[in-house]
UniProtKB/Swiss-Prot annotation:
Residues 148-166 have a biased composition (Basic residues). It comes from Equus asinus (Donkey). The modification Pyrrolidone carboxylic acid is found at residue 24. Residues 1-23 form the signal peptide. One of its GO terms (biological process) is defense response to virus. Residues 147-166 are annotated as: Disordered. The lineage of its organism: Eukaryota, Metazoa, Chordata, Craniata, Vertebrata. It is found in: Secreted. Pfam families: IFN-gamma (PF00714). Released primarily from activated T lymphocytes. This is Interferon gamma. The keyword Glycoprotein applies. GO terms for cellular component: extracellular space.
Length: 166
């Protein structure tokens, strides 16, 4: 690698690093704006313990943690939806929603749309309740582990190893 290539690579790394730092700095600034608006640094906020942090500590595996995180993200989206008309904190909420979109949904618009559809479903609607109960068996089947299918496939070929030896 010649000197010019080295300088260009170094500049690219510096630019990418500083833009990431800038994005994180903007994100933290917006969280601080929300904390100030809600007076979230007040000592009485800690009364009764944390809202989410203790629950997150109890879940260790990534797949399990994703379940809890989805509920927490759902809470924040509902919170931001309730405050959508508040112009004082709108920019902060938009910045944080964008960061949630990138981190939780991997920038997938379709995942975000599906998630938002789910959190908007009215639980008290009788028609929705009937549909949900109608779909319950399929949902439960989708939740069950697929390991039984793999075991069944393996047990169907008992002579597979013997043929290779002959």
């Amino acid at each position: 690698m010649n000197y010019t290539s080295f300088i260009l690579a170094f500049q690219l790394c510096a630019i990418l690093g500083s833009s990431t730092y800038y994005c994180q700095a903007a994100f933290f600034k917006e969280i601080e704006n929300l904390k100030e608006y809600f007076n979230a640094s007040s000592p009485d906020v800690g009364d009764g313990g944390p809202l989410f942090l203790d629950i997150l500590k109890n879940w260790k595996e990534d797949s399990d943690k994703k379940i809890i995180q989805s509920q927490i993200v759902s809470f924040y989206f509902k919170l931001f939806e309730n405050l959508k008309d508040n112009q004082v904190i709108q920019k902060s909420m938009d910045t944080i929603k964008e960061d949630l979109f990138v981190k939780f949904f991997n920038s997938s618009t379709s995942k975000l749309e599906d998630f938002q559809k789910l959190i908007q479903i009215p639980v008290n609607d009788l028609k929705v309740q009937r549909k949900a109960i109608s779909e319950l068996i399929k949902v439960m089947n989708d939740l069950s582990p697929k390991a039984n299918l793999r075991k069944r496939k393996r047990s169907q070929n008992p002579f597979r190893g013997r043929r290779a030896l002959q």
